[in-house]
């Protein structure tokens, strides 16, 4: 994460999957990828149908996305007070419901220290602690619902390893990532990949 020097100097909005290491960058405004949350919530809903809050939370996230998409179609860059209040209230209600369904395990005298949480409770606490980053996409319309584009950018790395087997050296892997990052950024900004590489070489 430190290798290319991007995140340490970054001052914008970074969307991620809530991996703990990302929160070590206090100067970044964080946004949580809702596609990752939907996958986790769907897993809980399918494997633990008694967890009624999970399916309700899926519905909430999708409704938030739907309402935002409609607002964007109408040329707006914000939601109505009604919708902000509705989503905020429903979010808190579902967190409360989830906590009631998944209370913290009691500690015993033999086991001291931090209480161990299961995957379900860990997700509940994440949703509670990072409510603002989760909901940022409806407050700032420049923030997407998910970071699927970033994940698509990474698929070429997987294709490369499948075709070539692996990178021979760590330095070679770093060079490959730098080149792909440069080409990907150029493409997003509307530049031809060939011209971008030629300009980088010729200065």
Give the ranges of each region predicted by the language model.
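Catalytic center-proximal scaffold of phosphoryl-transfer enzymes
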Residues: 1-203
């Amino acid at each position: 994460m430190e290798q290319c020097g991007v995140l340490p100097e970054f001052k914008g909005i970074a969307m991620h999957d809530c991996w703990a290491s990302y929160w070590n960058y206090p100067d970044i405004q964080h946004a949580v990828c809702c596609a990752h949350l939907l996958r986790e919530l769907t897993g809980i809903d399918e494997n633990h149908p008694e967890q009624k809050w999970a399916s309700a939370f899926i519905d909430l996230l999708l409704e938030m996305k739907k309402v935002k998409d409609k607002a964007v179609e109408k040329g707006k860059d914000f939601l109505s007070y009604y919708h902000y209040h509705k989503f905020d209230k429903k979010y808190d209600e579902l967190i409360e419901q989830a906590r009631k369904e998944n209370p913290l395990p009691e500690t015993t005298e033999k086991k001291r220290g931090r209480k161990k949480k299961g995957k379900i409770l860990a997700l509940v606490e994440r949703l509670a602690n990072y409510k603002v980053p989760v909901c940022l996409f409806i407050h700032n319309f420049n923030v997407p619902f998910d970071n699927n584009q970033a994940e698509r950018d990474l698929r070429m790395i997987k294709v490369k390893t499948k075709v070539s087997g692996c990178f021979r050296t760590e330095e070679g892997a770093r060079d490959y990532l730098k080149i792909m990052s440069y080409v990907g950024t150029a493409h997003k900004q509307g530049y031809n990949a060939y011209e971008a590489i030629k300009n980088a070489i010729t200065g």
